[in-house]
Amino acid sequence: MIRLAAFDIDGTLTINRSSTVLCLEAIDALRKLEKNGVIVVLVSSNALPVVVGLKKYIGLSGPAIGETGALIYYGEEEIVATTKYSAKQAYLDVLEKYNEYVYGSWQNMFRLHDYALKIRKQYLSKDNEIYSLIKEYVENKYPYIKVGYSGYAIHLTPKDTGKGKALKQIMEKHGIRREETMGVGDSIMDWEFIKETKIKVAVANADPELRRKADIVTTKPSGYGVVEIVEKILDKPP
């Protein structure tokens, strides 16, 4: 029986991978999981206030992971950092050096550890080239920082943290075994937490690499794939 289910947000709970519009059917599915006693965890690279705000307004009561795993929200009186480092210096450096290609996410003023860069519209067709350029520059100059690309933003994150580390801490705190968990995502960046779960799920339109690694690939994309896997879990628990 699944006791904890972890979900990425952008591209997973949205209507598709190029939109930030939530799939309302997916939100209903998450609520249904909670009503059936499953702890629902939102896992995101968004700033923590965004993740917590979303969690509260859609009616979830479980923990929330923000900043690519650097911060965990358990409640108003318990917010835990999983790293002592910050990528801010590297972020400011990249912003100055590669300003032609990228700009800072508006969420960065609400971040402490993980920082995000958005690719300018005129360069979106070269997103992977720009990502590779920045990744090589940052990881060579700042050995304590790793660089990832979600398809929405380029993230600079302390190497000693991640979505998987944060999810494992939550599992330990709640006394939940790997065999009792499920992880769902759309980006290869999500593999970091999905690999820590028993049932590893990629939505139909996920990155090819994530689809290859996952145990289950839904037949429907993004939020509609979430509805599909939740219905399967509740109807016939693995």
Swiss-Prot record:
Gene3D superfamilies with a match to the protein in the record: 3.90.1070.10, HAD superfamily/HAD-like
Functional summary from the UniProt entry: Catalyzes the dephosphorylation of 2-phosphoglycolate.
Cofactor: Mg(2+)
Pfam families linked: Hydrolase_3
The keyword ATP-binding appears for this protein: no
Catalytic activity: 2-phosphoglycolate + H2O = glycolate + phosphate
A cellular-component GO term for this protein: cytosol
The enzyme's E.C. designation: 3.1.3.18
Keywords: Carbohydrate metabolism, Hydrolase, Magnesium, Metal-binding
Amino-acid positions noted as binding substrate in the UniProt annotation, renumbered to this chain: K163
Enzyme kind, highest EC tier: hydrolase
Binding annotation for Mg(2+): D8, D10, D186, D190
Family classification: Belongs to the archaeal SPP-like hydrolase family.
One of the record's GO molecular function terms: magnesium ion binding
Active site: D8 (nucleophile)
InterPro entries tied to this protein: HAD-like_sf, HAD-SF_hydro_IIB, HAD_sf, PGPase
Record-given protein name: Phosphoglycolate phosphatase
